[in-house]
């Protein structure tokens, strides 16, 4: 099963590379944005972290599903996403896909084209981590298929480049036992095509 999860992750990375090269060659392609980041694996706030290390994260955000919503002067868009987080120390790596909600809080703060944003995502996850009866340095995630929630706050430097801080949580949300869950947090750079 771990080999299947690693194969799925490799296919996702290859698909991302292909989509990025296609999007770069054609500005009207299906890919809207690429985000790359470095994440702290196994973030905890009040307890000892079981899994630790550094994850490399890549995410494709596709063009919006419909016209932006304007709520209280903030622009809200919904975009499908597809991503991977690879644990560099051999612990739990994930592949995910779902829906991102992007909220542009304020535009043209310091210059034309910049602004501050909030993003949230809800995704399905496939992982290569431990399920049950795990060694002491691994999280027991209970199910091969998990859910993912992510939050991000960032600065749109110009119409193409952004920098952001992101945190996410994967877990089975009580649909299987055990349900240890896993958090990562870090910094990402975004590039819009």
Residue spans for each PLM region:
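Solvent-exposed loop/turn segments connecting transmembrane beta-strands
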Residues: 44-52, 84-95, 112, 174-182
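Cleavable N-terminal export/targeting peptides
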Residues: 1-29
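Membrane-embedded beta-strand positions of outer-membrane beta-barrel proteins
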Residues: 34-38, 58, 80-84, 118-122, ...
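Residue-level signature of outer-membrane beta-barrel architecture
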Residues: 60-64, 86, 101-103, 107, ...
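Repeated loop/turn-to-beta-strand initiation elements of outer-membrane beta-barrel proteins
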Residues: 34, 65-70, 107-109, 116, ...
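Sequence/structural signature of outer-membrane beta-barrel proteins
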Residues: 41-45, 65-67, 83-89, 106-108, ...
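Outer-membrane beta-barrel translocator/channel fold
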Residues: 118-150, 154
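Outer-membrane beta-barrel "beta-signal"
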Residues: 54-58, 181-193
């Amino acid at each position: 099963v771990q080999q299947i999860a690693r194969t799925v992750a490799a296919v996702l990375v290859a698909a991302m590379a292909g989509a990025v090269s296609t999007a770069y060659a054609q500005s009207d392609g299906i890919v809207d944005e690429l985000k790359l980041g470095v994440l702290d694996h196994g973030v905890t706030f009040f307890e000892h972290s079981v899994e630790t290390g550094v994850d490399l994260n890549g995410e494709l955000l596709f063009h919006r599903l419909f016209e932006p919503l304007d709520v209280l002067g903030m622009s809200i868009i919904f975009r499908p996403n597809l991503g991977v987080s690879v644990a560099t120390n051999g612990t739990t790596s994930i592949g995910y896909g779902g829906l991102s909600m992007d909220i542009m809080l304020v535009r043209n703060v310091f210059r034309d084209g910049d602004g501050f944003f909030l993003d949230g995502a809800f995704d399905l996850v496939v992982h290569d981590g431990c399920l049950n009866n795990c060694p002491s340095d691994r999280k027991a995630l209970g199910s091969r298929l998990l859910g993912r929630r992510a939050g991000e706050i960032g600065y749109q430097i110009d119409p193409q480049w952004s920098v952001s801080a992101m945190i996410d949580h994967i877990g089975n949300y009580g649909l299987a036992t055990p349900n240890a869950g896993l958090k990562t947090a870090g910094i990402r750079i975004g590039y819009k095509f």
